[in-house]
Design a protein with these regions (language model features):
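A general structural motif
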Residues: 36-38, 63-65, 111
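Short glycine-enriched loops at secondary-structure junctions
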Residues: 44-48, 72-74, 160-165
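Short, conserved active-site entrance elements at the starts or edges of catalytic domains
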Residues: 64, 68-103, 114
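Membrane-anchoring hydrophobic helices of lipid-metabolizing enzymes
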Residues: 1-43, 48, 80-83, 88-90
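Histidine-anchored nucleotide/phosphate-binding helix
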Residues: 48-61
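Short beta-strand->loop
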Residues: 40-44, 56, 67-73, 140
Length: 235
C-alpha cells in the first residue's frame, strides 16, 4: 500500500488506470444506477481500497458522480494533499462529519453513488457494538442508515491486488443477504444491521485475508465527539 499511494495520488488526472484494472461484476453498478434511486458502495480496508473510487469514477463518471467519505488528516499539509489528490473527474469527497453526511444524503437523493469504508471505527454515539470475527467491534450505523433513509441500492466492492504489480481486480457483489428491515425498535434494528454488515465484510475479507489491513485498530474504543443523529443528517 505504501508503494501504491504516491502513484495513485500524484499521477495526473489525465493518466487513466486503464489496463491495470479488471472488473468482475461491474454490470451490477450499471444496473443499480439505472434504477435511479442512488447507490451505496461499501468496501472494507481490503486490497487497494484507494483504487476503488478512482476506478469507479473513470468507468461510470459520465453517468454519475461518486462521493467518497474520508476522515481528514489532522495535519493541515496532509489534509491539503489528500483533498487535491482525490479531486478527480467524476469524484467528490465528503469529510467524516455532519457536513459530509448531509453531502452524501443529497447525492443519494439525486440518484448518485456514494462510497465509504464501513469497518472504520466511528465516533462515540455513531455506532453500536457488534461481532466482527467473533470479537465485539464498535461498528458504524451510517452505512446502513444511508440505505434506510434514502432507499438506495447497496453493493459491496473491493480491489484485489494481483501479484507482480500486474494491477487490480475490482470485485463487485451484492450482499449475501438483504439487510434486516424490521425489529422491535430502531436500536434493535441498527444492532441487527451492524451485525449483518460485519458478516458481509468478513465474507469479503475471507476471500483474501492476507490483503486485509489487520494493522487498522478495528477493535479500539470510539473517540468522543458530537454524535450525528438521523434528524441532524437530513438536509
Amino acid at each position: 500500500m505504501v508503494a501504491e499511494m504516491p502513484w495513485l495520488w500524484l499521477r495526473p488526472a489525465s493518466q487513466a488506470l486503464g489496463p491495470l484494472v479488471q472488473w468482475q461484476g461491474g454490470s451490477l453498478i450499471s444496473t443499480a444506477l439505472d434504477q435511479g434511486r442512488g447507490l451505496v458502495l461499501l468496501t472494507p480496508h481490503l486490497g487497494c481500497f484507494e483504487v476503488c473510487a478512482q476506478a469507479i469514477a473513470e468507468r461510470f463518471g459520465q453517468r454519475t458522480r461518486l462521493t467518497a467519505m474520508y476522515r481528514p488528516a489532522r495535519q493541515a499539509w496532509l489534509r491539503q494533499l489528500e483533498e487535491s489528490a482525490r479531486a478527480r473527474p467524476g469524484l467528490a469527497t465528503a469529510p467524516a462529519a455532519l457536513a459530509g453526511v448531509r453531502q452524501m444524503m443529497r447525492a443519494l437523493r439525486r440518484g448518485e453513488a456514494v462510497g465509504l469504508l464501513p469497518d472504520q471505527v466511528p465516533p462515540q454515539g455513531m455506532g453500536v457494538w457488534a461481532p466482527f470475527f467473533g470479537q465485539p467491534a464498535y461498528t458504524m450505523t451510517l452505512a446502513t442508515r444511508l440505505v434506510q433513509q434514502t432507499g438506495a441500492a447497496l453493493l459491496l466492492i473491493w480491489a484485489q491486488r494481483l501479484p507482480g504489480g500486474q494491477g487490480f481486480v475490482l470485485r463487485v457483489s451484492p450482499p449475501s443477504q438483504p439487510l434486516p428491515s424490521a425489529a422491535a425498535d430502531d436500536a434493535a434494528l441498527q444492532q441487527a444491521c451492524a451485525s449483518a454488515l460485519n458478516q458481509e465484510m468478513a465474507l469479503l475479507i475471507r476471500q483474501a485475508p492476507s490483503q486485509y489491513l489487520w494493522g487498522y485498530h478495528r477493535y479500539k474504543q470510539p473517540r468522543r465527539v458530537h454524535a450525528v443523529t438521523g434528524d441532524e443528517a437530513a438536509p
